[in-house]
């Protein structure tokens, strides 16, 4: 049973990595070729096709994985475009409303998630997997049809034409301007090749993601070191745009530990709930419905009560301060589940209702990080890079789930297991406290970087 749970956890986080990797593709084709609306519409149909595959190929492994792949492509591809498309509806005259609308957008997402988390496990057990997978597919098709009907009501910005001063062209110029840039790029490529050579040991997904992180991370450092050398070959506005994006990517990198913790509520926390006492009619996975329900309560509470109260006391709750606190709250939630796991490992059974506390802490962190991060990412992106920067925001989720797979792979090593047991903890409890410490370290680093971060304003002109 433990091996089955571990395998399910690995499949889940691999799927999440795919969902949040494909935004890079979706953001690029939207900004460069098709525009955000067309990308959203056609990839939504791909998503519907993937749901159909899940419904029809429940007992066919190949068909089932094809369905998961199509959903990852469709869902991932539209993610950066939807949030950027929301931002496109605002300009300098009404940008003050953007935060409210982004919060409402996030609230509506969780409204749907509430019903999915609460009802899908019931449909799965009572009606079977084909119906449980088919219902979301039908609803997705209906929403796509509504999007098509309302197409004339939206502000649709055209894709950016080929630009000799694009982000990639400026980066290429900077990297090639001096030996330092070329060395960093070479080290990044070498690290990527080294990661790919580890595919037999780590698996394709982990190795490929590590290769991508190596190229982006080391390449980004090389560009930063040499960006001034691009002056004269590219206009100042293009160089400033690249610098702005690189600054944002540093913050995104520090958010990745939050996603490591957050997405495990659907895997590690569900497995913990299996060991707790609960009514016979209640399934462990239904506990996840608490997350979107709390989001729907916390977003209006924060905007109408908490933030105004803090402002009255002279404390301005900026986006970066909210995100710093959110990462820390996520870490605190994992201290709580870690303590609960220690008690469970000691043989003491207790109610699943105890998970309400860590869910509340994690959800507060989610509202502070995720809902805030969507609006922050959009506001910091130059006009021609809205889709791509939102894709990088989604990529931070991929990397967060990558850390989960890396840690899980690490604890399969006998020497690592021996070290953990010598510490007095069982493996699962040790991992929980490890992830909590990971989040606290990230919150500290994020807060320090945020103190000197120069905010930009890239909303379009009216």
Model-found features: residue ranges?
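Intracellular loop-helix junctions on the cytosolic face of multi-pass helical membrane proteins
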Residues: 92-93, 99, 120-286, 301-302, ...
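Hydrophobic alpha-helical transmembrane and interfacial-helix anchor sites in secondary transporters
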Residues: 29-30, 35, 86, 123, ...
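C-terminal ends and interior cores of transmembrane alpha-helices
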Residues: 42-64, 323-347
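Extracellular/periplasmic helix-loop-helix junction of adjacent transmembrane segments
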Residues: 1-19, 94-100
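Conserved MFS/SLC helix-loop-helix module at the cytosolic interface between two early adjacent transmembrane helices
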Residues: 22-46, 51-52
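Helical-face signature of the major facilitator-like transporter fold
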Residues: 68-73, 255-259, 292, 358-363
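Glycine-rich segments within core transmembrane alpha-helices of 12-TM secondary carriers
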Residues: 18-23, 75, 96-147, 184-193, ...
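Intracellular juxtamembrane helix-capping segments at the cytosolic ends
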Residues: 77-93, 266-269, 359, 366-381
